[in-house]
């Protein structure tokens, strides 16, 4: 009963902590001072899971030893050192150049204690490994821990619940999320939809503190309190795009900037009666198939010609809701993550492997102090 009570108290603390944070990801309510205060609270509230009331006792009962050893096993499972297979994976990476000066003239230079291959650059004289200047540089937690973290992200788990499941602090979850965003920056830049393209916009509300009002009431409908998110889907359902338009009401200019490089010339455009889409039809010589809201209202999914894009709207909003306190200024980062989840490869383990390969081959080191500074926590 004591163990069950402690577990319930810990769960209650986590729920209270999540309410204080208002969700996961970048919180628009966090200032540098508040971030420091919250970190102090986290240190007080998140006491070590290996701390027991009998820890100082020289003699322990069989029951106490059972609980203590079980918790230690949990901790070890969640905080393992780098495995042999992980070291072999790191050492198998094909290093092309020095991560510091870009020189191709480097040579092997022994190994680290864990067996990781070290190199030395003949140009600048600096030593490095295959992970230098990547998001895994100076890692304290094995890369293998990322597998479970990414699987949770892909399944729409909140960052706080993922951190708790993995026995990590909430700040670790946020830090890793920022690293994830960094790897995925620009991932949609070269996506081009062809064939039959379904296109429609969806909208997200601004934070309450930034809502414009009239006579003390929120503006109705599509107003400047919304952030436009343009979405296009290919008919073969193999590709999609999720791009912030930056406008509350589409214009010919914003529509061109959002979609023009992502739709192949001569494609078939299936859309609603939004007037701004006309610039795409004109400049990309698209065949237009228009279905007004009045025509599609009340239709079942199977009968609605805009279902492919409407379904993505639904999934996107479900994903965003699972991260309620996301910072609207970083909405494109969230859309890049959602794009990665929704597009090939479909298998979740293939997706995890693809991300890890992208990360180790990307010179994008993210330092903790920079990542958790005011520019990210606003």
Where are the language model's segments positioned?
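Residue-level recognition of single "structural anchor" positions
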Residues: 2-378
């Amino acid at each position: 009963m004591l163990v069950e009570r402690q577990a319930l108290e810990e769960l209650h603390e986590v729920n209270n902590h999540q309410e204080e944070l208002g969700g996961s990801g970048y919180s628009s309510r966090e200032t540098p001072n508040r971030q420091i205060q919250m970190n102090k609270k986290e240190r007080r509230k998140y006491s070590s899971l290996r701390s027991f009331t009998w820890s100082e006792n020289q003699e322990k009962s069989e029951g106490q030893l059972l609980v203590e050893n079980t918790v230690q096993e949990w901790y070890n499972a969640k905080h393992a050192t780098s495995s042999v297979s992980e070291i072999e994976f790191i050492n198998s990476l094909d290093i092309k150049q020095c991560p510091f000066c870009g020189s191709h003239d480097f040579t092997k230079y022994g190994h680290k204690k864990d067996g990781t291959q070290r190199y030395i650059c003949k140009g600048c004289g600096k030593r490095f490994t295959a992970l230098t200047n990547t998001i895994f540089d100076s890692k304290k937690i094995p890369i293998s821990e990322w597998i479970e973290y990414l699987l949770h992200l892909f399944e729409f788990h909140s960052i706080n619940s993922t951190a708790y499941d993995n026995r990590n602090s909430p700040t670790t979850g946020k830090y890793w999320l920022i690293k994830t965003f960094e790897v995925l920056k620009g991932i949609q830049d070269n996506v081009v939809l062809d064939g039959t393209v379904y296109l429609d916009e969806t909208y997200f509300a601004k934070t309450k503190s930034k809502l414009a009002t009239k006579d003390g009431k929120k503006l109705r409908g599509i107003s400047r309190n919304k952030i436009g998110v343009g979405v296009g889907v290919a008919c073969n359902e193999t590709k999609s795009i999720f791009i912030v338009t930056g406008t509350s009401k589409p214009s010919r200019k914003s529509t061109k900037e959002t979609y023009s490089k992502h739709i192949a010339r001569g494609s078939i455009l299936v859309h609603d009666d939004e007037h701004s889409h006309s610039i795409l039809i004109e400049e990309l010589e698209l065949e237009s198939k228009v279905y007004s809201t009045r025509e599609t209202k009340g239709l079942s999914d199977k009968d609605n010609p805009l279902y492919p894009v409407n379904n993505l709207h639904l999934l996107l909003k479900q994903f965003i809701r699972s991260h309620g306190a996301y910072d609207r200024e970083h909405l494109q980062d969230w859309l890049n993550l959602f794009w990665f989840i929704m597009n090939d490869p479909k298998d979740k383990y293939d997706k995890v492997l693809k991300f890890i390969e992208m990360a180790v081959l990307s010179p994008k080191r993210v330092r903790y102090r920079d990542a958790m500074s005011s520019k990210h926590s606003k």
